[in-house]
Curated annotation (Swiss-Prot):
GO-annotated biological processes: positive regulation of gene expression; positive regulation of T cell extravasation; positive regulation of transcription elongation by RNA polymerase II; positive regulation of transcription initiation by RNA polymerase II; regulation of DNA-templated transcription; RNA polymerase II preinitiation complex assembly
GO CC aspect terms: core mediator complex; mediator complex; nucleoplasm; nucleus; transcription regulator complex
Protein name per Swiss-Prot or TrEMBL: Mediator of RNA polymerase II transcription subunit 23
UniProt keyword annotations, A-Z: Activator, Nucleus, Transcription, Transcription regulation
Annotated segments matching region Disordered: 1343-1367
Function: Component of the Mediator complex, a coactivator involved in the regulated transcription of nearly all RNA polymerase II-dependent genes. Mediator functions as a bridge to convey information from gene-specific regulatory proteins to the basal RNA polymerase II transcription machinery. Mediator is recruited to promoters by direct interactions with regulatory proteins and serves as a scaffold for the assembly of a functional pre-initiation complex with RNA polymerase II and the general transcription factors.
PANTHER family found in the cross-reference section: MEDIATOR OF RNA POLYMERASE II TRANSCRIPTION SUBUNIT 23 (PTHR12691:SF10)
Species this chain originates from: Mus musculus
Keyword Metal-binding: no
């Protein structure tokens, strides 16, 4: 091949001897040149046609090599003309020629003439190259230009500029050689943010990149760097807050020239999240950190160090380190964060200590030094045994810096808890010294002179063998010697002995013959807080080991109340999670269960129900799964344990947070049975109600009409297989539409009330006719017998006023688990009986018998009976009768009311501050003993039956606390039925005080007002009553201003029915300002300080958000008006809203409005329609400037030239950034139904792109269907605008954005719809968008790996595999 080629081309360039002798004197005529060209091409065409396809590239490369081997510019020029003609006549493919020319090793900038001629040829033929080829050529030319040094002779610059001209042609928008989006991607790869382009390209490249700033702006959320989340403890996080773990930057899609602040590390965001208590899961989610992979994260380390420095600065200004003060809470939280992140090796301890030293050097911050050493001691004492001494020595460097004293530091007052912090440095020295002595290290660290008095005090205290609990000496010794087993035994032994009891003394517990070890006073929280994590771990390990030992030995003596309460308190510490709650759920519970230690099992479940706080949702769902397993075991079929298991399960189900339900239940999609009850209809109904509430509050089903393809389907189907049931129409109407549709399709035939009555009469006749006792007992207690026995007992009491001994024996034989079905039938039977009652005397008789069954005979507990009644599905009049029975049971006799009022009056919900809970608990049970084994009936029968069943230990529970989760359900049922509103008000008046003991009163109120927003419209009095009852129940246990604002308390609580209070704008401003100040960490904050470990909410912002939403939903103002008033806080000029941090206010509005029901936030759509229809966007003459300046909120705001459109844009972004994907899923419908008909101008179109563009990434990740619909809507709008306009001024930014959308998000998923639209556009637009359609059947221009590198995505015929296809 080479020989043939050589002969063809040498023939055409050969010269005569005379020409060589007189170079430059001879010249071919144009005709001769042309003849040569034609003959050369003819010979080459013949050769080329005989060449195989595979050899084409090799052939072209040889030709280029041949040309570049020539030294005469004239020859090179002539041969290039040959190549040009070959390309122009279609003989050679232009892409192959261009690539061979540019990639030739001989093409060097020093050969200036060759360089100039080559790029002139490329410029001439590049128009024929396909867009993918042009993209590759652009990349190759840019890389070639990089070989030109920074300084060259000015003589050669002119020739080098030929390359620039090719680049200019490629980048020429009107030439449309390739999508400009590809060009900017290649340029930004070579010249990322902050890197200047090569001097040869001058401003050509930077000007071109600048034309993409509008596209970048369209894809950016206004003020994104100022938006902050509210941290919740469920760890639920959407993709909005993800950061790059190496740089802390936002993960931006595409290599666009985004605004500078978006490329900055988002330290403020991470720092804010780190500062929040219970934020560690969110931090891990934001940075993509996985506990299983030990990966050090230096940026996280830096922020932790900065937080410590900030705490040191705060301590410097605080007068005293008071109990529960801001500074103490901050140090407590810091300690917890540090241990977690260092323990999982996300941060390095020695690196952090050295960094701290560097940042504190020369600052003179020493007031907080003891607290800092206390934080460091936590980690050192727990990990020094497993790590090298060298890792901990940098602490001594820090000591030298922070403890400059030459004289001895005096011993602090050890009666105060702060003394443990003052001793922290001495404790650190003791641990370091112990490690040095034990290791091979010859290093001895002498005790610093300033710590000598502290050290001597500890030594002396250790010699005192009788340690008292009245000061902090024991804690000090535990902290100092926790790594020295000889010395540690004494103080730890003293702690343990205090709570275990001495083994001889006994104290009674509620119920018959139930005794416990005699220690009743738990270790106070102050003391537990004063122990290091290492000491706490030893203590909790000791307790868990003792519990397991007692479980194995099946001890008849119950655990000491002090031990149980202390164990509960230790479980609140997140730092000891592995031995704490994780060990409790994964090891202790299963071990106790296997040992059949039912008393201890009952105790552990009681602890979980009444003493646990902020337990992560996966542990709670794991426990729920355990409970369903437990419920099926024969040994748990006894009244007290069965009741406890069901009550605990009910609490777990109803307490699931709305954002927790989906992430937790999707973990069980393969086996939904594990989290559902096989036999308890009430628990499964409670789960469905929780599911309905969660999907409503999170707007999961918004825009959907079916549960097909969702995570709910299998769960609901399994429930209907286990416990088929129906829902009353008034309950069903509150469900989200897809759930309503499911239950209408899966309707279960109901037994008629008449049949029930007939069956009861039939069985009662049988009962009266039978005489043989054994036969009766067998007949009525056998499995498979209709569950009508309670109905028969009712009949006996109605007719004979007593129950025989056989009745008692049947009840006992039936067993706890089977009896639930009897209660269910009895609930239906009662409704029938009361419905058909003649009233008057007969009704009173019915009421008396029912109350006797509960309180006199103890046949069924009040909470179980009411739960069954509340969960039945009666309609109309029967539903009212059912609720009437509930009201009678709760209020008619004094039994329950007295129990409630005495319990509320004598007890406090702040159990962590109490030392005498056990005493109060026992006196309450003595006054109102729990009777769970039909004691009343056993005493009444003739002859009386002695009770055999011993009681399991009860440490915390009683009928009032057991009733609370049932009361939650009762209130909801009453809300659903309009005619029983007055009855609900009466219940709240008499029993509302119980909410003092609810573990999540504000969340319950928030969920209720949110879920029943439609039911409660125009029922302002009931709304007010509900809020007053629940919030008012806590008035004695919460400081003033903890929840509702003073303005609300003053006006709304006292408003008259005929004259409801309508707040002014200033009210809404103050309410938003309260959340803004809370999130900014203002000190003192708008809300009183509290110990967040025992609070309903994990941190101040979560508390502020929920109480604000409750107050707004409680107003006697329609949701639409409240929503508009919230938007007006920033959209109208408000004197109370400071200009300088307007985005913080928008952030707060976004958080609040998205946490409210749909009528509150949907008003934003109306505002957007108003702005889009306004003259500033519809009239071409109204705003003569640049639209991107008009939409740039930050620039407009800073220059005081803001307009309503930029404010509305920024506010919409803040709202949508905080929205759930369910709320966002209304955007496609909003675009097509509300905006598409009105968008006629370019400004309007660009405004819509600005609005929705930044959220395409969320749609791609979470709901692809919506992304596809939005993509099509964008093209429909473009068609509208194109048809309504004579000329488009901003065609390029529009097209750039559409290319970005295609290559980053939609791929080919919208190809078919879009092709039809593009065909109908005007030629100029159609030319620019031709690469999007497949009309020309052009290939994609990007390799598949580009998706991850920020380059355009590949095209395919389906939705890209990376897109999650969701509902």
């Amino acid at each position: 091949m080479e020989t043939q080629l050589q002969s063809i081309f040498e023939e055409v360039v050969k010269t005569e001897i005379i020409e060589e002798a007189f170079p430059g004197m001879f010249m071919d005529t144009p005709e001769d040149e042309k003849t040569k060209l034609i003959s050369c091409l003819a010979a080459f065409r013949q050769f080329w046609s005989g060449l195989s396809q595979e050899s084409h590239e090799q052939c072209v490369q040889w030709i280029v090599k041949f040309i570049h081997g020539q030294h005469s510019p004239k020859r090179i020029s002539f041969l290039y003309d040959c190549l040009a003609m070959a390309v122009e006549t279609g003989l050679l493919p232009p892409r192959m020629v261009c690539e061979s020319l540019i990639n030739s090793d001989s093409l060097e900038w020093e050969r200036t003439q060759l360089w100039a001629l080559t790029f002139k040829l490329v410029r001439k033929i590049i128009g024929g190259v396909d867009y993918k080829g042009v993209r590759d050529l652009l990349k190759a030319i840019l890389e070639k230009i990089l070989t030109i040094p920074n300084t060259v002779s000015s003589a050669v610059v002119q020739q080098l500029l030929a390359a620039r001209e090719v680049i200019a042609y490629i980048l020429e928008r009107n030439a449309c050689l390739l999508p400009a989006y590809f060009a900017v991607t290649e340029i930004r790869k070579l010249y990322p943010e902050g890197k200047l382009p090569h001097w040869l390209l001058g401003n050509l490249v930077s000007d071109f990149v600048d034309t993409f700033r509008p596209t970048a702006r369209i894809n950016s959320i206004c003020g994104r760097c100022s938006l902050l989340p509210v941290v919740n403890n469920s760890g639920a996080i959407c993709n909005s807050w993800k950061l790059d773990p190496a740089t802390l930057r936002f993960p931006l899609k595409g290599l666009l020239p985004y605004d500078k602040d978006l490329f900055e590390p988002q330290t403020a965001l991470l720092r804010y999240v780190l500062e929040q208590p219970y934020s560690r899961d969110m931090v891990c989610n934001m940075l993509g950190l996985n506990k299983q992979h030990k990966q050090r994260c230096p940026v996280l380390e830096d922020q932790l160090v900065d937080l410590v420095v900030y705490a040191m600065e705060r301590s410097e200004t605080e007068e005293k380190f008071d109990d529960g003060g801001t500074s103490q809470l901050l140090w407590q939280h810091l300690s917890s964060q540090l241990i977690f992140f260092v323990l999982f090796q996300f941060a390095s301890f020695p690196h952090m200590v050295l960094s701290l030293h560097q940042k504190l050097a020369g600052r003179g911050l020493i007031k907080g030094r003891d607290h800092l050493m206390w934080v460091l001691l936590q980690f050192i004492s727990g990990s020094i045994q497993k790590n090298a001494l060298a890792d901990f020595l940098p602490v001594m460097k820090l000591f030298d810096l922070l403890y400059p004293e030459k004289e001895c530091i005096p011993v602090p007052d050890i009666n105060k808890p702060q003394s443990t912090h003052a001793f922290a440095m001495t404790c650190i020295w003791i641990h370091l010294n112990r490690k040095a002595q034990n290791g091979d290290s010859t290093l001895q660290i002498p005790i610093p002179h300033s710590l000598k008095l502290h050290h001597e005090f500890l030594q002396q205290s250790l010699r005192n063998k009788s340690l008292q609990m009245n000061d902090y000496k024991i804690a000090l010794l535990c902290n100092a010697y926790s790594t020295n087993s000889e010395c540690f035994t004494l103080p730890m032994g003293a702690l343990v002995e205090t709570i275990y009891g001495n083994g001889i003394m006994r104290v009674p517990l509620p119920g018959t013959s139930c005794l416990a070890s005699a220690s009743v006073t738990p270790l106070p929280m102050n003391l537990l807080d004063s122990l290091t994590v290492h000491a706490k771990m030893s203590l909790i390990h000791s307790i868990a080991t003792r519990v397991i030992k007692l479980a194995h030995t099946k001890s008849s003596v119950a655990l000491a109340p002090a031990l149980v309460e202390t164990y509960s308190r230790l479980l609140v510490y997140m730092e000891i999670e592995s031995l704490g709650i994780k060990g409790f759920i994964s090891q202790l519970l299963p071990t106790v269960f296997k040992s059949h230690a039912w008393g201890i099992l009952h105790t552990l479940l009681e602890m979980f129900s009444h003493r646990m706080h902020h337990i992560q949702p996966h542990y709670r769902v794991q426990l729920l799964s355990h409970l369903h397993t437990l419920a099926a075991v024969a040994q748990t079929n006894q009244n007290q344990l069965h009741l406890c298991v069901e009550s605990t399960a009910l609490r777990l189900i109803t307490a699931l947070g709305s954002s927790e339900v989906q992430p937790q239940f999707t973990r069980f999609l393969n086996d939904p049975k594990t989290v559902l009850s096989a036999e308890s209809e009430e628990l499964n109904r409670a789960l469905i109600l929780t599911l309905a509430r969660a999907t409503h509050v999170t707007d999961f089903f918004t825009g959907s009409d079916s549960i097909q393809g969702t995570w709910c389907k299998d769960i609901l189907q399994t429930i209907m297989n286990f416990t088929p049931h129906n829902w009353a129409s008034h309950t069903l109407s509150c469900f989200p539409a897809p759930l309503q549709a499911f239950f209408k399709q899966n309707n279960v035939p109901q037994e008629s009330r008449f049949n029930l009555k007939k069956n009861v009469e039939e069985e009662y006749r049988k009962w009266k006719s039978m005489t043989d006792e054994n036969e009766i007992i067998t007949q009525f207690s056998v499995q498979g017998f209709p569950p009508l026995f309670l109905c028969l007992l009712w009949k006996m009491l109605l007719e004979t006023d007593h129950i025989s001994q056989i009745g008692y024996k049947v009840l006992e034989r039936i067993g706890a688990r089977a009896l639930v079905a009897h209660v269910r039938t009895f609930a239906d039977f009662l409704v029938y009986e009361f419905s058909t009652s003649a009233g008057g005397q007969q009704l009173n008789k019915c009421i008396e018998i029912l109350n006797d069954m509960v309180w006199k005979y103890n046949i069924v507990t009040l909470d179980r009976l009411i739960l069954c009644l509340a969960m039945r599905s009666h309609e109309g009049n029967e539903a009212q009768v059912c609720y009437f029975i509930i009201q009678l049971l709760l209020l008619k006799p004094n039994d329950f009311r007295n129990r409630v009022s005495d319990f509320v009056k004598e007890n406090s919900p702040e159990h962590w501050l109490q030392s005498d809970w056990h005493t109060k608990h026992m006196s309450y049970h003595k006054k109102y003993p729990e009777k769970l084994y039909f004691e009343g009936l056993a005493e009444q029968v003739d002859p009386p039956v002695p009770i055999q069943s011993p009681y399991l230990p009860i440490y915390f529970g009683n009928v009032c606390l057991r009733f609370l989760p049932v009361f939650d359900i009762v209130i909801h049922r009453f809300l659903e039925l309009l005619p029983v509103s007055k009855s609900l008000e009466t219940l709240l008046d008499h029993l509302g005080g119980l909410y003092k003991f609810h573990d999540r009163p504000v969340t319950y109120l928030y969920n209720t007002l949110h879920y029943y927003e439609m039911c409660l419209r125009n029922r302002d009095h009931l709304k007010r009553k509900l809020v007053h009852a629940i919030i008012g129940s806590l008035k004695d246990n919460r400081p003033q201003g903890w929840c509702l604002s003073d303005t609300y308390l003053k006006h709304a609580m006292n408003a008259r029915e005929d004259n409801p209070w309508v707040p002014e704008d200033s009210y809404y401003c103050k309410l938003i300002g309260r959340l803004v100040d809370t999130m900014a960490g203002k000190s003192p904050g708008p809300f009183p300080n509290c110990d967040w470990r025992f609070n309903e909410f994990p941190n101040p912002a979560a508390h502020a958000l929920h109480v604000t939403c409750v107050e707004l939903m409680a107003l006697a103002v329609p949701g639409k008006d409240v929503g508009n008033a919230l938007l007006n806080v920033v959209l109208k000029s408000q004197p109370l809203v400071p200009r300088e941090n307007i985005t913080a206010w928008m952030n707060a509005i976004g958080l609040i409005i998205t946490a409210l029901p749909e009528p509150y936030w949907i008003v934003l759509h109306d505002r957007i329609v108003n702005v889009i229809s306004s003259s500033s966007l519809t009239s071409e003459t109204e705003w003569v400037g640049y639209p991107f300046r008009l939409f740039d909120f930050t620039a407009c705001h800073q220059s005081y030239s803001e307009m309503s459109c930029s404010y509305t844009l920024a506010l919409a972004h803040a709202v949508w950034h905080h929205s759930s994907i369910g709320q966002l899923s209304l955007i496609p419908k909003f675009l097509t139904e509300a905006l598409l008909p009105v968008v006629k101008t370019e400004f309007q179109l660009l405004y819509v792109y600005h609005l929705v563009g930044p959220f395409l990434q969320r749609f791609q990740q979470e709901r692809t269907r919506c992304m596809i619909e939005i993509g099509v809507a964008f093209y429909d709008m473009l068609l509208n605008v194109d048809q309504c306009s004579t000329h488009l001024n901003y065609m390029d930014p529009i097209c750039d954005f559409l290319y970005h959308m295609k290559y980053m998000f939609t791929g080919d998923s919208v190809k078919e719809q879009v092709e039809k639209i593009i065909c109908n556009l005007k030629p100029a637009l159609k030319l620019r968008l031709r690469f999007i359609t497949h009309i020309s059947k052009m290939e994609p221009a990007v390799p598949p790996q580009a998706l991850n590198s920020g380059s355009p995505a590949p095209q395919s015929n389906q939705v890209p595999a990376s897109l999650p296809v969701t509902q």
